[in-house]
Amino acid sequence: MTELKNDRYLRALLRQPVDVTPVWMMRQAGRYLPEYKATRAQAGDFMSLCKNAELACEVTLQPLRRYPLDAAILFSDILTVPDAMGLGLYFEAGEGPRFTSPVTCKADVDKLPIPDPEDELGYVMNAVRTIRRELKGEVPLIGFSGSPWTLATYMVEGGSSKAFTVIKKMMYADPQALHALLDKLAKSVTLYLNAQIKAGAQAVMIFDTWGGVLTGRDYQQFSLYYMHKIVDGLLRENDGRRVPVTLFTKGGGQWLEAMAETGCDALGLDWTTDIADARRRVGNKVALQGNMDPSMLYAPPARIEEEVATILAGFGHGEGHVFNLGHGIHQDVLPEHAGVFVEAVHRLSEQYHR
């Protein structure tokens, strides 16, 4: 494989010295970029874009042509795994993802296959290989998956949810069925991420978008336990380099200590967690990624820079910080404001690495 020219992101995740704080943005390949909208229109629809390796590669690289980002993230969707299990994923205008055959009971769980990453999910691996080739070693490529709990919410609710009553009903009335589903998902995600690593992903991230809707006890049993199983099963070295793993539970700032015990390399923070407090609590065990409020990108450039400076000062001197937003970039943000953000992180962070 090509020598990596910029390994700042990987070094920061492993709490090794860097010259400036590395930065990337969740959903950096997305609808705020006019060029993304053009490519998506060419593909026809969202899943066709995900399933075409050349087009998925194109949208992955688009933000890197605009901004000096320190990592690329595979363009895909967390729902590829449930889709490959045969639940019939489709997108309803204005409603987001839906499944034609949601999981309602243990019998449904028993029928679900564990997808072969090189078969049903082969299009994702083709995209990873294509992107790695086209990156030419400029920056590392991040692979990712949804967490078992987060995937289960979509599979049981039949799509997006605000109250999560359907899955919580299963959790409390039929916990055995939910544990069986989560166990199958943990096995599927482990295979899926390991296949991404073998195909060329140089770091991986597990997105637990909905872990924060659980009580502390339920989070441990129904979300964190299964992420821990995945971390235990991941390839941690490939191509002679360590493959760092980041866990991100949105709304999970109160559980950082428990998350750091999983053996992951880094934790993602949303904007509701104070990064100085997070570093005091777990900074001796894991790197931290985050955590500017994505809505800050609506602010004037001077205010964006001020917020970047505040977060950098909060983390302080030394290693182990990857700058990011606290969740995905919003689709109506001005691309120029994203540029201000990235430039400010590099310029203002230099003093913390001397």
UniProtKB/Swiss-Prot annotation:
Pfam family, one: URO-D
Catalytic activity as recorded in UniProt: uroporphyrinogen III + 4 H(+) = coproporphyrinogen III + 4 CO2
EC number: 4.1.1.37
GO biological process: protoporphyrinogen IX biosynthetic process from glutamate
GO MF terms, alphabetically ordered: uroporphyrinogen decarboxylase activity
Keyword Transport carried by entry: no
Site (Transition state stabilizer): D77
Subunit structure: Homodimer.
Name under which the protein is recorded: Uroporphyrinogen decarboxylase
Family: Belongs to the uroporphyrinogen decarboxylase family.
GO CC annotation: cytosol
Membrane-crossing segments per the record: none
Pathway involvement of the protein, from the record: Porphyrin-containing compound metabolism; protoporphyrin-IX biosynthesis; coproporphyrinogen-III from 5-aminolevulinate: step 4/4
Binding site for substrate: R27, Q28, A29, G30, R31, D77, Y154, T209, H327
Function statement: Catalyzes the decarboxylation of four acetate groups of uroporphyrinogen-III to yield coproporphyrinogen-III.
InterPro entries: UROD/MetE-like_sf (IPR038071), Uroporphyrinogen_deCO2ase_HemE (IPR006361), Uroporphyrinogen_deCOase (IPR000257)
Keywords: Cytoplasm, Decarboxylase, Lyase, Porphyrin biosynthesis
Organism expressing this protein natively: Escherichia coli O6:K15:H31 (strain 536 / UPEC)
Domain of life (superkingdom): Bacteria
Localization: Cytoplasm
